[in-house]
From Swiss-Prot:
Gene name tied to this protein: OPG147
Record family assignment: Belongs to the orthopoxvirus OPG147 family.
Protein name: Virion membrane protein OPG147
Subunit description: Part of a stable entry-fusion complex (EFC) which is at least composed of proteins OPG143, OPG147, OPG155, OPG086, OPG094, OPG107, OPG104, and OPG099. Formation of the viral membrane is necessary for the assembly of the complex.
Main subcellular localisation: virion
Function: Envelope protein part of the entry-fusion complex responsible for the virus membrane fusion with host cell membrane during virus entry. Also plays a role in cell-cell fusion (syncytium formation).
Length: 115
């Protein structure tokens, strides 16, 4: 009987640890999606580079605005918004653009971890 009680306590303890973690993850993902929808395909400034996001089947992907494989600086955000510009997705590392991976990580963290 004591064994059954200990097993029951174990499952209650695990349940109380896992469920809040899952709900916190879902809350954070929902907040990121709301931030994504609020951007409405406009660019944001991250590390003096213009980033935007696309919602794909594998989730939200960050992309950087480029002109001839050179990231467009934040000072040109008014010229770039709502226009067709070339973009590079952050799913692959680019050695020809210095600091590309760091800026991509920051773009994701700005979307998911804003407070």
């Amino acid at each position: 009987m004591i064994t059954l009680f200990l097993i029951l306590c174990y499952f209650i303890l695990i349940f109380n640890i896992i469920v809040p973690a899952i709900s916190e993850k879902m809350r954070r993902e929902r907040a990121a999606y709301v931030n994504y929808k609020r951007l409405n395909k406009n660019f944001i400034c991250v590390d003096d580079r213009l980033f935007s996001y696309n919602f794909t089947t594998s989730g939200i992907k960050a992309k950087v605005a480029v002109n001839k494989n050179v990231p467009i600086p934040c000072s040109k955000i008014n010229e770039v918004n709502n226009k067709d510009v070339d973009t590079l997705y952050c799913d692959k590392d680019r050695d020809d653009i210095p600091g590309f991976a760091r800026s991509c990580y920051r773009a994701y963290s700005d979307l998911f971890f804003t407070t």
